[in-house]
A protein has these predicted regions:
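Rhodanese-like catalytic fold shared by cysteine-dependent sulfurtransferases
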Residues: 2-22, 28-60, 66-115, 190-193
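Catalytic subdomain that performs nucleotidyl-dependent activation
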Residues: 170-171, 241, 249-330, 334
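Short phosphate-binding/catalytic loops that engage adenosine nucleotides
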Residues: 82-84, 197, 302
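ATP-dependent adenylation/nucleotidyltransferase module used to activate substrates
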Residues: 104-256, 260, 268, 291-292, ...
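A structural preference for short, hydrophobic beta-strand core positions in alpha/beta folds
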Residues: 42, 87, 173, 201-203, ...
């Protein structure tokens, strides 16, 4: 039987265990789905606190959270209740680091983009590039990497596009450190090395700036991030920044605007910057489905962080049960339910903003001006 004086077990010790054990990941379901240790069972912390009989008492229980802090306290409490429970030292991040040390997937990942995911990812990426004119000759693009699956895939796709070299353009793989904890920074840099992505990292103090903001800190953080990315990209001679928003982000944004904002709008494939003259924002994953990105990640056995915010373990606004996180989750679930009735629902939502008939709209905005159907009502009648 495994014994530990401080209730801790390392990754190496766990791998060498010769007794049966249960590995329990206590993070929320979304974080677990985003990436987890092979063989782990997901029982969120709240459920264990409500009913610890969900855990076995007849064998070793190894508890895991993101960084090993929350699961450490839980392990101690469970031991007081008679469980043989230990905490995985360093949590999920320690397992990620061990993966980086043992595996190098860059070549296989690149091959998978050209072969297995040619139709579902590569072709849709290039279709967006062409259809929306996202990349043009002599562009210098800052490919913005947050550390998640979307931006890392986008970086690999841009490398593949550059390899084809049909016209001249330059790339900078830009990572902004807004005040990451050591573990988050390490995961991002390790993934970049593993995938052979030459990143340029710069630091800001955004997390300190939003730390005491009670209302919508995530929204403020996102806005500040974009501003810093524009500024740094321009300093590096770039004329565009590329963000990793995908097809599902687009249709969710359309519905969120209608249901929660009372407006019809979409997430555009490209935008002119309002504060940085000559700069543009592009979204090359605009036509790529999130399910295919997850498939690519899992097929290549890649592991990324869900949110690089240093407060994720304790910040309620990062929780799927909070207002900030739950609205998009509600929309995701709504779309999934509607798809069961109509398989075309996602495509219909996406194309709805391409098929707007202004003659059937009560009013619309163009710049700072609001146009009512009454302004042209008489002219519409004369035209019939």
């Amino acid at each position: 039987m495994f014994k530990s004086e401080n209730n801790q077990i390392t990754i190496e010790q766990m791998r060498k265990l010769d007794e049966e054990y249960t590995l329990v990941d206590i993070r929320d379901e979304i974080s677990f789905e985003y990436g987890h240790i092979d063989g782990a069972k997901n029982i969120p912390l709240a459920k264990i606190k409500e009913d610890n009989s969900l855990l076995p008492k007849d064998k070793l229980v190894v508890l895991c959270c993101k960084s090993g802090q929350i699961s450490d306290e839980l392990a101690e409490n469970l031991r007081d209740d008679g469980f043989n429970a230990v905490n995985l030292e360093g949590g999920y991040y320690s397992w990620l680091r061990s993966q980086f040390e043992n595996e190098d997937y860059a070549t296989d990942v690149e091959k998978s983009i050209r072969k297995k995911f040619s139709k579902t990812i590569w072709s849709r990426f290039t279709a967006a590039i062409i259809e929306y004119k996202l990349v043009e000759p002599n562009d210098k693009i800052a490919v913005c990497i947050s550390g998640g699956k979307d931006s890392m895939l986008m970086a690999k796709l841009f490398q593949e596009l550059k390899r084809h070299n049909k016209f001249p353009f330059e790339l900078v793989f830009l990572v902004m450190d807004p005040g990451y904890c050591v573990e988050n920074r390490d995961v991002i840099e390790s993934n970049a090395r593993r995938l052979n992505i030459p990143i340029t990292v710069f630091e800001t103090d955004i997390f300190n700036s939003v730390y005491n903001v009670d209302k919508y800190p995530c929204y403020l953080c996102a806005r500040m991030r974009r501003g810093y990315l524009y500024k740094k990209a321009k300093q590096l001679g770039c004329n565009k920044i590329a963000l990793g928003h995908h097809y599902d982000d687009v249709i969710e944004t359309i519905l969120m605007g209608m249901l929660y904002g009372g407006q019809v709008q979409t997430m555009m494939p490209k935008l002119h910057s309002t504060n940085y003259e000559g700069m543009e924002l592009i979204r090359p994953l605009y036509l790529v489905r999130e399910a295919e990105i997850k498939h690519w990640r899992d097929y290549n056995k890649l592991n990324f962080i869900q949110c690089a915010c240093r407060f994720t373990d304790t910040c309620t606004t990062c929780s799927p049960n909070s207002n900030t996180g739950s609205k998009r989750q509600e929309i995701k679930q709504l779309i999934a339910n509607l798809k069961k009735i109509n398989p075309q629902i996602e495509s219909n939502i996406f194309h709805s903003v391409e098929n707007v008939n202004l003659d059937t709209i009560i009013s619309y905005k163009q710049g700072d001006n609001k146009v009512s159907f009454l302004d042209r009502y008489d002219d519409m009648g004369k035209g019939k």
